[in-house]
A protein has these predicted regions:
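Conserved catalytic core of the tyrosine transesterase superfamily
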Residues: 1-177
Length: 177
């Protein structure tokens, strides 16, 4: 303020550097917790949602914008539109494929959206709906802070732990190069 008001030429605060603090390592979801979440799902939609998030690492916004027509079950891939409307292909595992197919067979609506609400009028699921549902599932099992982005972080961490190059992981996650 003194510098802005021309009472002093240069603030002595400019010589003071911020102290670097350690960034806490962000938590991932354990394999056991993933299995417990799967086992606790009471509807096919939630199971398909968990497996798709876990196996692809897509953002929750990409998940809710997916349409059934963008899923290729033969190739086990789907086209997602990420940040800045960037299109990319992501691949899901066999478990996700089975649970997605079970979920789609159980649906009685004609909505083109991949994930819809459980009750009529079966609207496209919103980001908040996914977040709330995952939080509820986690709380039922006394699992702390279960949210969509944690699945993304878990997928990336597992891929790196298994030896995948970080550049490849960034590409899968849709990070700009």
């Amino acid at each position: 303020w003194l510098e802005e008001e021309d009472y002093i030429l240069k603030s002595p605060m400019r010589r003071i550097h911020k102290i670097k603090t350690k960034q806490p390592v962000k938590e991932t979801i354990s394999d056991e917790a993933i299995e417990r979440l799967r086992d606790n799902c009471k509807c096919a939609r939630d199971l398909a949602m968990i497996d798709l998030l876990y196996s692809t690492g897509i953002r929750v916004g990409e998940l809710v914008n997916l349409n059934i027509s963008e899923i290729d079950f033969e190739a086990r891939e789907c086209v997602v539109f990420g940040k800045g409307d960037k299109e990319r292909r992501v691949y899901f595992d066999a478990k996700a494929k089975l649970h997605l197919q079970d979920y789609l067979r159980s649906r009685t609506d004609a909505n083109p959206a991949l994930f819809v609400t459980l009750d009529a009028p079966f609207d496209r699921l919103k980001i908040s709906g996914v977040e709330i549902r995952l939080r509820e599932l986690g709380r039922e099992l006394n699992l702390d802070k279960i949210h969509p982005h944690k699945f993304r972080r878990t997928m990336a961490t597992r891929a790196i732990d298994k030896g995948m190059p970080i550049e490849q992981v960034q590409k899968i996650l849709g990070h700009s190069q």
